[in-house]
């Protein structure tokens, strides 16, 4: 397995208020398990959902790609959810798949999807640049996990925000990046 060639960049951002159109699963553990579980729910299999999301106009992250990934505006997300499964970080969450939309979005909401308002908030970004999916995906994932695990918040004035409802985005587009965007809050 080839090692990831680039380091993980870490920075803070403020993301403006937006909407998130998505499906949600309280039991899945990762992307493949998410779609396996969703395939058991009528109308929520990967092909159906990705096709519906491709038809949504005004996706904030759409780079014009045709593949159902971050390049076409489709992303995984995790919502802090007290009734969700406990993830490897010890945080109860629900896994989601969907698209970010502007706050003034007033278009279609497919019946099997949820549309929520996400307020403006601060986030920490862990980002790895372009990589070869076949030879580097595993090593990039390891580098990203290590960067998040080892990040020292003590000198930043922030900590992870584990409040119910806060959302954590995951962008996977090997041509551009692997990016985790996690909610933070100021330390009092």
Specify the residue positions occupied by each region the protein language model found:
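A solvent-exposed interaction/effector surface
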Residues: 1-188
